[in-house]
From Swiss-Prot:
Range of residues in the leader sequence: none
Species: Mycobacteroides abscessus (strain ATCC 19977 / DSM 44196 / CCUG 20993 / CIP 104536 / JCM 13569 / NCTC 13031 / TMC 1543 / L948)
HAMAP family named in the record: FolE
GO-annotated cellular components: cytoplasm
Protein's name in the database: GTP cyclohydrolase 1
Keyword Hydrolase recorded: yes
SUPFAM superfamilies per UniProt: Tetrahydrobiopterin biosynthesis enzymes-like (SSF55620)
Pathway where it operates: Cofactor biosynthesis; 7,8-dihydroneopterin triphosphate biosynthesis; 7,8-dihydroneopterin triphosphate from GTP: step 1/1
Keyword list, A-Z: GTP-binding, Hydrolase, Metal-binding, Nucleotide-binding, One-carbon metabolism, Zinc
Length: 204
């Protein structure tokens, strides 16, 4: 089996990199396990395709999400910054099927008025979503990264998602959604501020 790619730094705390050959071999074994022939027409290239897809789906494992927030601007802005309805796709770590939906991210800059680019917030969501996840942890990781890098007065993150592990198997309830929130700083202490930003998030 070929050796995996190597990198001086890839941002993942275990130092792992994606092993294409090993992933392909695993998909072949899975096809055998479910009673398929991975060498038949239509499946011959599937292990390579699936491995490449997983490399993209789990790209967040190989980049340090905090680096996305390295570029900040001292704008002396001390009011709410809110980015709503950021589309996101993640993978349930229990069944390795998708959960997808939207993230709403709001923060109040700290005493220096430090802000980051709006696209950086969307990128942060992507990098934490693109790994085996549970929705509760995903929501908290986004909030905690903003606290670490921006030192804001308050952060609130709300994620709304449909889980295919609940829609296509088990209880089979397509259309059911799960909402999680992570609240930090001023939004945690001040119920009025929290209610105001939640109202803004939920408006269409």
């Amino acid at each position: 089996m070929n050796s995996p790619e190597t990198a001086e730094y890839n941002g993942h705390p275990t130092g792992h990199v994606f092993d294409q050959a090993r992933a392909e071999a695993a998909v072949r074994e899975l096809l055998y396990a479910v009673g398929e022939d991975p060498d038949r027409h239509g499946l011959a290239d599937t292990p390579a395709r699936v491995a490449r897809a997983y490399r993209e789906i789990f790209a967040g494992l190989y980049t340090d999400p905090d680096t996305v927030l390295n570029t900040t601007f001292d704008e002396q802005h001390d009011e709410l910054v809110l980015v709503k309805s950021i589309p996101m796709y993640s993978t349930c770590e229990h069944h390795l099927v998708s959960f997808h939906g939207v993230a709403h991210v709001g923060y109040i800059p700290g005493q220096h008025g430090r802000v980051t680019g709006l696209s950086k917030i969307a990128r942060l969501v992507d990098l934490y979503a693109k790994r085996p996840q549970v929705q509760e942890r995903l929501t908290a990781q986004i909030a905690d990264a903003l606290v670490r890098k921006l030192e804001p007065r308050g952060v609130i993150v709300v994620v709304e998602a449909e889980h295919l592990c609940m829609a296509m198997r088990g209880v089979r309830k397509p259309g059911a959604t799960t909402t999680t929130s992570a609240v930090r700083g001023q939004f945690k202490r001040d119920a009025a501020s929290r209610a105001e930003v939640l109202d803004l998030m939920m408006r269409t």
